[in-house]
């Protein structure tokens, strides 16, 4: 069948796509790690939307999490069989249900985070671009095929999973650990959770990720009598600055496959400051987000951080009320060692390149990013995966939006992938 017929069908579903996206944005799906209830309500809404669609199979896998609503983090798989059912490689399209917290509400000037509005060809709201746009695009790519009675060349598996934003412990990582039978080495995987405004960037590699929290314990005292205690704030500031300089100097290699081409080490959070200007705090925390080129070993970075803790601790060492201070502890909040990149000549890369060239008339660019997508989990299993979408890159920002044209046009590419 002429692919243009499918594209016209997708265009005819534009308003349905917008309505679906608006409905999903209205439901907060913030992780319990970030103070939310999780994804239960959003998963229920999604199941309600697709219950009468002619999927061949819909499966739900609930990861136990007592902190979440009803004690579970839902993961949904919807299958639309291809012409050869299980005989040919299957195409996975993975999106996530969860969203990041709204942040500073005063900076949301177009609308409130979970009260979506449609304006100037965009849908505003938290989770609109990350990852609602691609979630809805994947749904309606398949819906168009269903409406036309078309079976794709290969089976499509739409995966809607939890916990992407805070580590995937209750999402894809849990699925792979508890249900390895779901995955096959010959699967083709598209993760539409990264890209550029032109829709030409195909990500095949990611940096390693290390989130580490440095906890400094001193002794709180009145700021006018600092000698009676130990100011944890001062110790933490020196430690953070010294570590920042050390990591940038020691791990300074560049790899032009990635953007940016160097490793990044960013102090992102601080905690436990004093609650009055005349208190020298007894505790302080600093968090580093490290995105490290695959050529480096994360153990070396952790060892450097630990060694520096010893040096800084020795510099400020003193006994207060019988206790030797400071105590500097390093906690690994998240760690993901970068797997080998998806080969440039793998089938999913070639198919996506062909679709972009043929149906967008643009030359695709292959590269790597700072990490943090589902693709890394598949690559660790030896399953080729790519990250691609057309994005204005408003994710995690106030006034986040999804451009409707991007959503519709990406649905066309997703449908084409299933047919090529």
Locate each region found by the language model.
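Metal-dependent amide/peptide-bond hydrolase catalytic core
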Residues: 1-5, 12, 41, 194-199, ...
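Short beta-strand segments
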Residues: 94-96, 159-161, 190-193, 217, ...
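Acidic/histidine-rich catalytic neighborhood of metal-dependent amide-processing enzymes
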Residues: 129-205
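Acidic/His- and Gly-rich active-site-bordering loop/insert found
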Residues: 2-124, 147-152
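Glycine/charged-rich beta-loop-alpha catalytic/anionic-binding loops adjacent to active sites
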Residues: 113-125, 217-218, 360, 392
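Short, conserved micro-motifs enriched in small and acidic residues
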Residues: 121-136, 149, 227-233, 401-408
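Short, solvent-exposed loop/turn segments at the edges of secondary structure
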Residues: 73, 111, 153, 185, ...
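Structural motif
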Residues: 89-92, 122, 157, 187-189, ...
